[in-house]
């Protein structure tokens, strides 16, 4: 769990790579249902066949399933994961069979808590996970990231952009502006636009400032 752009998915992908396991990215949304996760019947060659869902395939192959933004889905849809994540380690496929999980199978869920469109996870599901709270990036690590992504960027500007992001973070913490503009991806995109010749002001507007749609808030961000 953690704010946006704190590296939740990167951590999950690197864990899968470190263990040498295939990874399935499963993006959750409000219309997600059990069939989207486990699989569903479909017609193929004039016959009804079972089309495997990503959780089913991950369980069979012993992969790492990354349940991205798990708190976007309805709790009813997530109930199918209960048997997968507890001592049973199995998937019940209605009308077919009970599928045991391969021993290597792991599931990692990511979520931004309290964001628009998200909902509370029920306690039954939450109790099946251990929770890592992802910290916000420090000044030192932010400068390392900028140097790694933009090796041609002058050290002075690396520091300036790092401080810009941290200043926005302070404004968000003090509720002067919303979290919409606190977007590390947006800052990196703005720097890429500058590299392609877009003026700095316009690039920062597109990458950061315009993420807040209120004109008064935009003026606060520009300050």
Predicted regions, residues:
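Alpha-helical lid/collar subdomain of P-loop NTPases
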Residues: 138, 147-223
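AAA+ P-loop NTPase catalytic core and its hallmark functional loops
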Residues: 1-166, 173
């Amino acid at each position: 769990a953690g704010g946006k752009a704190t590296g939740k998915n990167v951590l999950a992908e690197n864990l899968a790579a470190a263990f040498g396991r295939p990874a399935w990215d499963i993006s959750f949304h409000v219309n997600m249902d059990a069939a989207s996760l486990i699989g569903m019947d479909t017609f193929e060659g004039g016959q009804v066949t079972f089309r495997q869902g990503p959780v089913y395939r991950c369980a069979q192959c012993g992969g790492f399933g990354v349940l991205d933004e798990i708190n976007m889905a309805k709790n009813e849809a997530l109930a199918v994961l209960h048997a997968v994540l507890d001592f049973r380690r199995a998937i019940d496929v209605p009308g077919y069979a009970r599928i045991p999980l391969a021993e290597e199978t792991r599931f990692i869920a990511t979520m931004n808590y309290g964001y628009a469109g998200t909902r509370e996870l029920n306690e039954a599901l939450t109790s099946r996970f251990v929770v890592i709270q992802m910290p916000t990036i420090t000044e030192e690590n932010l400068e390392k990231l900028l140097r790694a992504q933009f090796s041609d960027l002058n050290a002075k500007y690396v520091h300036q952009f790092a401080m810009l992001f941290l200043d926005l973070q302070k404004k968000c913490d003090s509720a002067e502006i919303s979290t919409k503009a606190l977007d590390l991806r947006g800052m990196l995109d703005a720097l890429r636009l500058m590299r392609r010749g877009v003026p700095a002001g316009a690039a920062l507007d597109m990458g950061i400032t315009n993420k807040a749609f209120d004109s008064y808030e935009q003026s606060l961000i520009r300050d």
